[in-house]
């Protein structure tokens, strides 16, 4: 098997070999090359010690000397070069207490997480595949190297990585590896919220975001997203739905494009339903105000998982208003844009579409027609530059002060009253007309 390696990476391999050391590209770059994907990074493993690597190259950065890693700079790119190593005892379910350098490539590959990530390649000696990684790629399987209980005990983040790789590649998790996931899922408590967030986002942004189901079945989501587990066991006895809340969420994830805000919104859009669910005397379920409840819960979840404030703001607002259903008139849609926000309204339309497609077929045509009218009205509002917020109102606070108003709450209240007039009739968004309305309390 011949893999195409970037010229700079091949140069590093050649320099190391010429100096008498072994050197290979290793891990994810080998996996992705075999899969026909374009690797993000090209990592190199070598028998040379860090100080020996530094002696061979003019430009290096000490990125992880304690783990044997030196970054070699070639032109404008950096390549991590790491000495063959054996990890010592893991003291926190995440990091080895110490690492020991070794002269054996096999020992280095043996410590890696999954067989598909434990392959090395060198143009002269070809593919080194000691654990069946190539066969597992061909069979589309995620399998731990060696004993899965040991691999997941060493580093609990591998529990998330197993599901994430499965979702990114569309692979199945091998049976023994899957069993180990279930046993050791509680070890995720040793992993920081930031690291769990990174893996969750990668899973959600994958071609198979619904593989979150695998994480649920293995008891993984119970450790960091128990609110989702509650959704998986909450039925929806209503003609509008044909799935549990959780299954509806999983289906909806597949109906939005690969966008971080959209995918997280779909994950959390109905998170409030288990809390507000009421069943009437006919056995029909109702979920009134689930958007409001969901907004609060989504904020708690996103803060817990250490998401940035901008993502929290966008997602919680979309969760709050995701079930808002204006009719297709431009007047109703102007008010909806004002409520939801100009920046988020296009997202809201995509959320509504995905939500509908993950429901039952009940009144589907009618629902689609209403949504299409909303989209048309929104296009009209945008094309005609109609005012939907204070920032485009023809009158400003300064105008009101010049008209005799005192700075303070009254100005804000007056501007909002004038905005209401304009939302009802955009033709009135003219300075003279609005100033003429000031005496009409």
What are these regions (language model features)?
Residues 1-441:
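Catalytic cores of the polymerase beta-like nucleotidyltransferase superfamily
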């Amino acid at each position: 098997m011949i893999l195409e390696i970037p010229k700079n990476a091949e140069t590093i391999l050649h320099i190391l070999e010429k100096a008498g050391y072994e050197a290979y590209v290793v891990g994810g770059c080998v996996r992705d090359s075999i899969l026909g994907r374009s690797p993000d990074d090209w990592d190199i493993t070598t028998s040379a010690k860090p100080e020996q690597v530094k002696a061979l190259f003019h430009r290096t950065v000490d990125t992880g000397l304690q783990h044997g890693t030196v970054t070699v700079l070639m032109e404008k790119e950096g390549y991590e070069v790491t000495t063959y190593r054996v990890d010592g005892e893991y003291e926190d379910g995440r990091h080895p207490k110490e690492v020991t350098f070794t002269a054996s490539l096999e020992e280095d590959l043996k410590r890696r997480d999954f067989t598909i990530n434990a392959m090395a390649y060198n143009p002269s000696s070809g593919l080194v595949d000691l654990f069946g990684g190539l066969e597992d790629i061909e069979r589309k399987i995620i399998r731990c190297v060696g004993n899965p209980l040991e691999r997941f005990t060493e580093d609990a983040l591998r529990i998330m990585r197993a599901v994430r790789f499965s979702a990114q590649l569309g692979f199945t998790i091998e049976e023994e590896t899957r069993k180990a996931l279930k046993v050791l899922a509680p070890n995720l408590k040793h992993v920081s919220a930031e690291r769990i967030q990174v893996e969750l986002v990668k899973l959600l942004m994958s071609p198979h975001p619904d593989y979150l189901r695998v994480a649920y079945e293995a008891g993984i989501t119970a450790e960091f997203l128990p609110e989702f587990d509650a959704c998986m066991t909450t039925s929806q006895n209503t003609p509008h739905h044909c799935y549990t809340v959780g299954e509806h969420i999983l289906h909806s994830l597949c109906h939005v494009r690969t966008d971080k805000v959209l995918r997280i919104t779909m994950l959390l859009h109905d998170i409030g339903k288990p809390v507000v669910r009421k069943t009437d005397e006919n056995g029909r379920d109702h979920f009134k105000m689930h958007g409001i409840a969901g907004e609060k819960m989504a904020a708690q979840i996103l803060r817990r998982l250490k998401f940035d404030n901008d993502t929290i703001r966008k997602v919680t607002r979309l969760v709050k208003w995701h079930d808002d259903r204006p009719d297709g008139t431009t007047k109703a849609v102007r008010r909806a844009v004002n409520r939801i926000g100009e920046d988020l309204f296009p997202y809201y339309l995509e959320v509504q579409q995905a939500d509908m497609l993950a429901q039952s077929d009940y009144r589907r045509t009618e629902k689609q027609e209403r949504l299409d009218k909303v989209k048309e009205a929104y296009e009209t509002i945008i094309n005609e530059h109609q005012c939907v917020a204070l920032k485009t109102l023809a009158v400003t606070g300064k105008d009101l002060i010049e008209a005799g108003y005192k700075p303070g709450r009254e100005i804000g209240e007056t501007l909002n009253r004038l905005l209401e007039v304009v939302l009802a009739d955009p033709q009135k968004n003219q300075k003279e007309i609005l100033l003429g309305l000031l005496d009409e309390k």
